[in-house]
Design a protein with these regions (language model features):
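An acidic-aromatic pocket/loop used at catalytic or ligand-binding sites
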Residues: 58-87, 180-207
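Short, structured protein-protein interaction patches enriched in aromatics and acidic/basic residues
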Residues: 11-19, 34-58, 62, 151-181
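Extended intrinsically disordered, low-complexity coil regions enriched in Ser, Thr, Gly, Ala
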Residues: 15-38, 132-154
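Surface-exposed beta-loop interaction hotspot
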Residues: 63-126
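N-terminal/domain-start segments enriched in small and hydrophobic, helix-friendly residues
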Residues: 2-15, 50, 55, 92, ...
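Surface-exposed interaction/gating patches
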Residues: 2-9, 99-150
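C-terminal structured domains
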Residues: 158-224
Length: 224
């Protein structure tokens, strides 16, 4: 009965549920549009699946022994995702890779990207490669600058979006795909967490209402 504020998360440990109860809960919650895979630096992993109730997340995390622990969370995004999104490198110009043949706007875009990463007051900021004259060399230059992060996000809806964290703090590589037309949009998003991943407050309110209806239906018992 509470809508958590942005970056606040409500959590419930599912370790006390028996196998039947856990199966029932998973069936009830289903699978929503967002799935996340996080690979920690120490080798541990987290797997996150949004439920059909937007903003309700099923989270599986490995503990220090490598065992999987499951819990349920409610919020705009799960706690593990907020935490992992900050464990990256703050850049300086020394990170710029050497220029390569075929560069058009790659160096200018790289300097723009680094400037916004260094100044959180200018975030969020988007560099939409789809709407800019960029070459394959530009894309490779930006990819080498940003490196690979430890978070992979997939969303499904009208199409599929692939959102990958880079090795730079608050820099995300976003690609929106269409099964027939291929790549629709490619961008670098500079922000703590892309809005595309987060459940909006109105989505959380809608989920609360729907869960209230489900709880009422369960409490009423089977029909006579």
């Amino acid at each position: 009965q509470k809508i958590p504020a942005k970056q606040d998360v409500l959590g419930w440990d599912l370790s006390t549920l028996n196998a039947d109860d856990l199966t029932f809960l998973n069936t009830l919650l289903g699978e929503g549009e967002v799935s996340v895979r996080i690979q920690q630096a120490d080798g541990r992993a987290s797997e996150i699946q949004e439920s059909i109730f937007c903003g309700i997340w099923r989270v599986r995390c490995q503990n220090d022994l490598g065992q999987w622990e499951e819990h349920l969370e409610a919020g705009s995004a799960p706690r593990a995702l907020w935490q992992a999104a900050t464990i990256t490198t703050l850049p300086d110009d020394s990170l710029l890779p050497p220029p390569v043949d075929g560069l058009m706007n790659g160096l200018t875009l790289a300097q723009e990207l680094l400037a916004h990463v260094r100044d959180p007051a200018t975030q969020p900021h988007s560099i939409n490669l789809t709407q800019l004259p960029v070459s394959d060399a530009d894309r490779q230059f930006l990819s080498r600058l940003c490196g690979e992060g430890r978070i992979q996000i997939r969303t499904i809806g009208y199409g599929e979006s692939q959102i990958d964290a880079t090795a730079l703090r608050h820099v995300w590589h976003v690609r929106c795909l269409d099964t027939l037309k291929g790549l629709l949009l490619e961008s670098y998003e500079i922000c703590p967490l892309p809005e595309l991943v987060q459940a909006a407050p109105e989505d959380l309110r809608d989920s609360l209402q729907r869960l209230d209806e489900v709880c009422g239906w369960l409490a009423s018992g089977p029909p006579a």
